[in-house]
Amino acid sequence: MKKSIPILLAVLLCLCTQTFAQNRADELMKQAQENLAKKEYIKARYLFLQAYNAFATQENYAQAVKCGVNASALYHRENYYKEAFELLRNAELLVRTGEQKLKKDFPDLRFRINKERLQMYISLRNPTRAKEQLNRLEETAKAAQNDSLSNDFLYTQASYYYTFGMNSQGDTAFKKLIEQYKQKRTTPKRMNAIKIS
């Protein structure tokens, strides 16, 4: 009986600590978003970075990547490219570790990281590195087999081409995007709904 009380207290303490850590990470992210809305970018960046670290510690990969990408975007906004690239490298390493640990791929998380890296290369006017990231983004979107990511990729691809003066290729990407929207509108379920009515 006496041995079970300390064990029970230890388990209870661990559960309370874990709950507190989760709530703390969520609170940091909420505060970061509020500061971002107020255009307090430095404070928002700091809070996103703290939330990223908290979520990474908890192995909450989706939230960690979300916060990491937001913090990176704020570094990039202030021309702190070294810090932004380093944070994205760390986020990518976190995702790779999570994939190995869970034996599951996270193409949607890789997509977010690659897209932010692409935006930074576009801002730096580095077409070669931007094209490499665009190719990685395409591979990731295909691996995800997700319509939303596929549409996001086509829009990003068009933006890339227009930014670097390749207007005909940008037009082609937009046409593909429009075709995907048209196909989505005329899916078999939608056609059956039209026939029924």
PLM-predicted stretches and their roles:
Residues F20-S197:
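A "functional boundary" signal
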Residues M1-Q31:
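Bacterial Sec-dependent N-terminal signal peptides
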